[in-house]
């Protein structure tokens, strides 16, 4: 017998609802069986935002044009990038498209198979996947990547939403793997040594 969100066991009512996700759970719990679909949906949403921003730039800013965005900090500048993130490896569009496709496939498999089992680790893979797919779409259908964010306070390459996802996701994934994976995913590294030590003891 159960009530609304309640379950009767041994004459005692229990709450049978899972607690809502929160930052504390994200940082402290690991769920190897967690459904990867929410992360796929988040990646799709980030790709949609990236493509929407690029579409608005294409429709409203001429090539090389400038539009104020955040005074004294950022302006929107329409640039066609035939290279990788931040204009690296220019004029290698199709090679970069193939690399982006391969990376996207690897990231999908890693996310789906639980390369990182903790939600925080999976979030880093989600950011990387969104960035790779966002720029892959440009290279495949336009032959170049649309960049628009131009920093006014420093000499830096013009970039886009997908580039932000790649950089934030890449740095976060590296830091997570090096410094947090052992703590948040204790069974991931050194499990063999731990089992041997227990057997010897």
Question: Where are each of the predicted segments found?
Answer:
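Alpha-helical transmembrane bundles and membrane-interface segments of multipass inner-membrane proteins
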Residues: 9-17, 21-201
């Amino acid at each position: 017998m159960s009530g609304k969100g309640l379950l009767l066991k041994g004459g005692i009512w229990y709450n049978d609802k899972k607690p809502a996700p929160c930052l504390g759970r994200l940082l402290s719990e690991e769920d190897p069986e967690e459904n990867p679909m929410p992360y796929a949906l988040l990646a799709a949403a980030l790709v949609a935002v990236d493509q929407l921003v690029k579409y608005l730039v294409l429709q409203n800013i001429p090539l090389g044009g400038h539009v104020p965005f955040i005074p004294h900090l950022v302006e929107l500048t329409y640039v066609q990038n035939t290279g990788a993130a931040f204009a690296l490896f220019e004029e290698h569009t199709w090679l970069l498209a193939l690399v982006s496709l391969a990376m996207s496939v690897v990231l999908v498999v890693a996310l789906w198979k639980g390369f990182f089992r903790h939600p925080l680790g999976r979030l880093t893979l989600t950011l990387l996947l969104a960035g790779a797919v966002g720029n892959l779409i440009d290279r495949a259908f336009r032959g170049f990547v649309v960049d628009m964010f131009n920093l006014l306070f420093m000499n830096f390459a013009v970039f886009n939403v997908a580039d932000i996802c790649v950089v934030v996701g890449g740095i976060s994934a590296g830091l997570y793997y090096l410094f947090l994976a052992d703590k948040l995913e204790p069974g991931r590294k050194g499990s063999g040594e731990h089992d041997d030590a227990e057997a010897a003891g």
